[in-house]
Structures are given as structure tokens and as C-alpha cells.
Amino acid sequence: MRQNYLLLSLLLLTVYLSGCVTDPLEGSWDYTIRVGQEEFSGAMKLSKNGSSYTGTMVSFDMGEMLLTNLRIAGNKLQGDFQWDGDPCIIDGVFQDANFEGTVQVGQSRFPIVATRQSEPAKPYDPPVVQYILSDKDVKDSDGNIDHAGLIGDFSMEGYKRGGRIYNSNCINCHGIQDVEGSIPTAHKFWSQAFKAGYDPFSMYQTISKGYGVMPPQLTLTHQEKYDVILYIRENFIKKSNNDQYFPVTPAYLARLPKGSSKGLEAKPYHPWSDMDYGNFLINTYELADEKTGIKRFHSPGPTPYPDEDYRQNNFAYKGIAVRLDAGPGGVSAGKAWMIFDHDVMRVAGAWTGEGFIDWEGILLNDKHETYPRTIGQLHFETPVGPGWANPSTGSFEDPRFTARDGRHFGPLPKTWANYKGLYHHGDNVIISYSVGNAAILEKLGMERGAGQIVFTRTLNISPSRESLKMRVAAVGTNVAVSGNGASLKEEDGYVVLHVSTFSRAPIKLFIAKPGSSSLDEFVKRASPPELLDRYTKGGAPHYQETLNTNVTKGKEDGTFAVDLLTPPFQNPWKSRMKLSGIDFMKNPDIGVLCTTDGDVWKVTGLTNNKGILTWKRIASGLFQPLGIKVLNEKIYVTCRDQLVLLRDLNGDDETDFYESFNHDHQVTDHFHEFAMGLQADKAGNLYYAKSGRHAREALIPQHGTLLKVSKDGSATEIIATGFRAANGVCINPDESFIVTDQQGYWNPMNRVNWIEGKGKFYGNMWGYNPPADTSGAAMEQPLVWVDMEFDRSPSELLWVNSKKWGALDGSLLSFSYGYGKIQLVLLEEINGQKQGGVVDLPGVKLLTGVMRGRFNPSDGQLYAC
């Protein structure tokens, strides 16, 4: 049996009016099955036809389970049903309005008790309420709604939808049990009596029409309103405020207003594709034609999962996906795209279609063990490998690290090709890189004519000491070129661009899918190659709006006061605001924060005590940012593919050039290899951690490591190995390190690791090149083992550096990504071994998990996200 998500009373009821039930057993019986410490709830429904009975076991999350071989003799019942695929036998006895018995699953028996559903002795009479809107105001939308049907259709899917609505909207005002919302007087479902009625229909009226300071929730559909009511009733009221849990009975449903429509259904939930990421989005993509591409394949268990043979799959591991057609909504709303892979300086391919990608991925649609893939028609592609030949030899042979599965990973040698960064100017995305000593600016584009789509690559190439060669597409693809000093040849199955040594001149490539008409006339009519320098000076801001939010002051009657600094969840770009890093500018009133969806935001008003925060989006389209650091007023961001230095070239508070400060990162298609945290030592060197492959053995040396990047960004060094999920870095006062790790394969519990020196191994035998000895003697012991029940996912640690924290100044904090807590780490050293324990800071329970934090140098307070 799979684990129940929540103990819920059955709300899927057949209407049996109490006055119509003549058989003492016929009707609905609320049941509870106890399995160890867990309880599974639902209803048993019995109907009599002549002398025989039919029945079902109806569970909130399992649906309807038919009772077969049902036998009722006197007050005894026996029958069979399937529970989550397991055959079960129910056997028990009725006694007046109660039922007791057992459910047998295999060789195990579990107790079941049930009580007949009945009407309350006194009919419920909801209060008279003065709503904000009148019945007339909502007549058009609510006049024919089947409320009984909507309540009766409650399901686990509805509960999950309601949870998403509550935790993305309602929580801001109402909060949760441990954390007060932004409006202290907002109703507390878990402890207070309802003023406007506590039955589902009255709650619906409150949501639809508004009451008191709560405005009508006009954007919610009828289904969504009842979804969030279900979540509130089952998650808060039933658990903690049971006196306010209204029993939904057949007679209650019969009294509700009649209607034949269930109104608008819940809106599809896909915030990952609704978001406007800007005109580019960096990620790892697989390019595949939706109709003819290689079928997606993932190895089955057992763990460690064996390597797939992906040598024929076209992965752009550091793929810059660029939207080519005009229009609002960013890359996700486009119809045509190209991907540039900055690992190897190649255009991986171009495609058209509806939807951009399939959005598969842990930080996209929350899916594990997968990666995003293009959807639509693939017009052309190039193989994984160098896009430009080695300028010294003219060879395309790939010299990069070869993994166990035969694939190559990591960037090309910088003397061969070197990615410089990306300019974002209006709708133009200009990619800057070098091949040999030649500096290149490249713009991807698309043009239409004569009934066909033609993709373009405009290149501005500085003079080169050597002639250059670039693979454009497979032979058979329709390719043409304009510009001086460039020609096309067929070599080894590919159309190859040859660029001779020449004075600076622009080149324009035209590429159309095989079978399209000749490009000769198209090229004659097309615009000439464009000079791209004008896009490197800084353009008008893409995100001009600033957004204001409130600071909700916390109570000061406990050990700690926690203020809630609300992000702008409602924003024009539908950014999900999943904050993943924080730091401060020289003016400590200004902070910068990154998000997992690729944004960087600047927030003003942190220390001026006005209670208003002003937010501005200053960067977008980055690859899973999970760390941010300000050094000398320069903003550095840890991304999965690179460390990015944000450059504002014209002073308008928005990034014009995304400089690749370091791109030594080795990136594979695996979903779990996050690059996490960002810290700097006194010399200016930068540090981040890279996670391993979850339930798989490492493929690359950087899997599960602590990494050092030199202060000039020119080199990366592995400091420590053997991590599974290293969520960030802490630098100690003596410039040793602390890195946490999460429980899982080879980690019996979560670890807090104190790291001194270089080259040591920290326990995950599925890391790269682990020791032969699998015993504890071969690995460094942690500072603390952290039990999963105490903190299921520790993140980054931070030393307290604030006199405002009194006796805790100089102590060590640990953030809980899993439980939204902050903990104090108590440590000592015995015989050279650092050891200790962790305790929760009293009264600190946050609305979300905590991953990063910094102490503000001005007010001395901790800011965490």
C-alpha cells in the first residue's frame, strides 16, 4: 500500500436522506483503518437491492474501491476489495450506529472502525453576512452552479491544487500555524471561530464576494475556490480546530442552491511555461524532432542506475536557447528558436513549434530523473562536439574529458575557443566568444520568404592569424553564405564554413531544412550582414517596472523577532520568486537576490525602517542560479554552467552584458548536479559546491565536489570530493570550510562537514574516483550527523558576525532547507576531530525552507531566503 497523503473524511457522498433509509445497514459509514501509527480514512457505502447488498469503500485519495463477494448475514459483514492493488478482506460486525472489524492484507490484519453518517440534531443555520459584493454582483457567474456536485467531487488532486493556491496566495495574509501572515487580523483557520459561516458553501461565499478586509477572489475559478476550501478544511481546521470542521452530510448537500453547471474548471497549472524568462534561457537541452527524434529513455533500477547510451543524443549541455520570432512573453512564448552551446561554441540546432520545450526537469515542472527536450519540428542540427575546428590544426577531433559512458564533457581549451559572455540589447542576443586569436560576435536570427523559414547566423570576426573552419549543418541541409572572405565546402558529411585571414568583415549564414527551395534568390533579397558592435553598448531596459511590497514586522515577545520581507510574487513576468541567494551592495539598504528560475533582483529599503521594499528585476535567463556574491560593487552569480559577472553598461540598473567570469564547469544532463552557493576568501578567490548524481555514480571529476575559482576567473581547482547534495559553502574564519550533505545513498544521515586542506574524501562512494576502502576509515568524519527527523535537508552554514545578536555573536548557524528552521551548531574539538551537535533557535519557524543568509553590515541583522 502506498502511503496516504493526509487523513481526510470522505466528502464524495451519495445522497441518502436520513428519513428515507429503512434498512439499518444501508447508507454511508465513515471508517478508519489503523496501520501502525498511520490512519487511513474514507467511507463504506452500502445499498440494498431486494435481498442483496452492493457496496464500495471510498477513500479520499484512492477513489472508489468496489466490494466484491459481499456477504451480510444479520449484523455481520464480509467482503473483498482492492486497496492500491493489494487484495484485501474486510470482516466485521455492526452494533447500532457502529462497526468494528479487521482488514486483512496478505498475512497482516489491521483494525477498522466505522460510524454511520447522520444528520446533526439541530440543522445548521449559517449567519447573516454583509459581504463586499452582493448576490446580484455574482449572479452571472454563480447563478447556475452545482455546489453540491462540486463539493461531492472533492479529491486528492483538488486538495493538491488547493494547497498550491493557498501556499502561493492565501499564505501571504493568513500565514500558517507557526508563522503569522502579513495581516495579523486575517482569519486563523487553525484556531479561530468563523464569523461568516464555516460550512463549505459559506466559505465559498466569503471567497467569491469578499468579507471584511478580504477582497473578492475574482481570479479563481469555481473549482479552484472549492479546491482551496478543501485544503483549508482538511489541512488546518480538521487537524487543529475540529469544532469548526463542518460535517458534510447528504441533507446538507440537498439544501444547497441547485444548478446544472460546475463552472470553469481549475486553470492548468504550469507556472514554469507561463513565466517570461526574457528572450533567452540557458539550460541543458536535448534537441529532438517531436515526430522523428530518438525516443526518450531512462535506465531502470536497481540503483545505482546504469548509464544510458546517450552518444547519439544531441544534448546542448550549456545551451543558450534564443527566441527568434518577435512578440511578448519571452522565450517560452515563441514559435522559433536556436540553441548555442557555449561549451563547444556550436549552434546545436534550430526548431519551430508550439511550446518551446517539454519543461521536464526538477527546477521546471518538478520532475526527477529527467531533462528538458525541444518540442516541434527540428530544421537542422549539429553533432555534440566542437563547433569550430582547432585553429592550430584544422581538426574537429574532440579533446575534452571522456566519461565512462563515452561522452565528452566540459569546455574546450581556452586557446581553442573561449566563451566571453552574452549581450542582451532589445530583442537582440549577441554571443561573444573567441576562436584562436579571433574575437567573434554572433547573432542568431530567422527570416521568412518564398514560403519557407530560413535561420540565420550573423558573425563579426576579427582578423585571425589562422584560417578558421566551422561546421554549419549536415550535408543535405540548404546552406548559403554572404560576406567577404567566407566560403562553404562539404567535408566528412557536413557543410563547413571556411573563413580566411582577412580584415574585419561581417558574414551571414542562411540555413534551411533539407528539401527546401534554393537559397540563391533568398540571399539576394535578404538584408546584408549586420555590424553587431552597436549592440554591445547597453540598450533600453527590458524590465522598467519597479514593484513595491511590505515588510511585516514580527512580534518581539520571544527570543527572536522575525520580520517577513515579502517578494513581489505578483509581477508582470510571472516570475515564481524562488529565492536562492542574497547579498548586499555597498549601500546596505540595497540587496541583490537570485532565483532558481534564472532571475536576479535588486531590492531597496532593507534598512531604512520605512516598511516598504522596492524591487527591480535586473537580470534574467540564467541557468539555475543558486548563489550570489557582491565584491567591490560587482555582482557575481553561481549558475550551473558558469560564474556570471553582471555588467550594467549604461547605468540603467539592468544587466546589458552577462560576462562569463568562469565557465570551467563540467555539465551533464543529470537533473541533480546543482552548482550551489558562492563565497569569497580574503584574497578574492571564489568557492562553490557541485552536487553529485543522486542515485547514480559520478561521470565527471566535478561531481560531488567543493570547487575554488581563482580571483581572476582563469582557473578552477577541486578542493574536496565525496559529496552527494552539497547545498552551499561556508568559509570559516581560518579559511577552512563547512559543507553540508544530504542523507541518501552512502549517507545514512545528513552531514555537516568541516573541511581542512585539500584532496580529502567525504563519504559518497558514488562520487568520482572514490577510495577502494568502503569503510568509514577511508572517509573524513563529519562535524555533525543530523537526523532526518530533525532536519531532512540542511543547506548552508553561516557564522554570526553581529553585536546585535548578543551572546550568539561569533557562533555558527545552520539553515534548514527542509523544515524552514535556523539552528545553532555547538562544536568542540577532541583529539583533532571537530565534533558537535545542532539545536533549533527557539521560536524561529519560517514559511519556507531557508537556503542562504547574510548579516547586513549596517543593521547587524540576519537576512535569509
Place the predicted regions along the sequence by residue.
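Gly/Gly-Pro-rich "capping" loops immediately C-terminal to redox-active cysteine motifs
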Residues: 163, 175-205
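Detector for the c-type heme attachment site
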Residues: 173-179, 195, 208, 232-234, ...
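Beta-strand-rich N-terminal accessory domains
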Residues: 249-456, 473, 487
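Sequence/structural segment immediately N-terminal to covalent heme-attachment motifs in c-type
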Residues: 156-176, 205-209
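Extended acidic/polar, glycine-enriched regions
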Residues: 477, 485-541
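Beta-propeller blade termini and top-face loops
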Residues: 548, 553-865
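Central antiparallel beta-sheet cores of small beta-barrel/beta-sandwich binding domains
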Residues: 23-110
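Flexible coil segments in periplasmic/lumen-exposed cytochrome c-class electron-transfer proteins
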Residues: 123-156, 167-168, 215-309, 526-565, ...
